[in-house]
Amino acid sequence: MLPLYEKADALSRKVIGAAIEVHRHKGPGLIESIYERCLLRELELHSIPATTQKIVRVEYKGLVFDEPLRFDLLVDDCLLVELKAVELLHPSSKAQLFSYMKLLDIPIGLLINFHEPLLKNGIFQMVLPGANQKEGSNDSQASL
């Protein structure tokens, strides 16, 4: 197993614990941005570095995409977290997370839906096989 994958896997458990703590205090029914701020605070309290709402710059053969893409949380540069607060997750939510993971070459992602009464029913983990193992160059790339 790759060291970055192992690091992301260990962090995913800590982030899930932090999300459960936020959900225990705030419950379902709030808007996504509130959960994002609370989760970021919970991670700060545990000295887990995370950045929020960064723009993902996408480029393809010299073409830079004008459409801004923003992820919710990047934890310690190896775990991507997308947050939702919706009654029913749309399949596009998982596709969005997977796209960000591919663009940023991140091995593990979490999709967390805080609207669920029991949060464990709203947590999905995704793994990007081969992430962060680039040998050659890609035709497309992304950066923060």
Report residues per predicted region.
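Solvent-exposed, charged helical/coil patches
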Residues: 1-49, 120, 125-144
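Residues at secondary-structure transition points
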Residues: 6, 10, 30, 34, ...
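Conserved catalytic cores of phosphodiester-cleaving nucleases, focusing on short active-site segments
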Residues: 27, 50, 71-89, 100
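Short connector loops at helix/strand junctions that flank enzyme active sites
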Residues: 38, 45, 66-70, 74-78, ...
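A short acidic/basic microdomain associated with nuclease active sites
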Residues: 44-61
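A structural signal for short, well-ordered beta-strand segments
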Residues: 54-56, 71-73, 123
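Acidic pyrophosphate-coordinating catalytic loop
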Residues: 60-66, 120
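Nucleic-acid nuclease catalytic cores
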Residues: 84-144
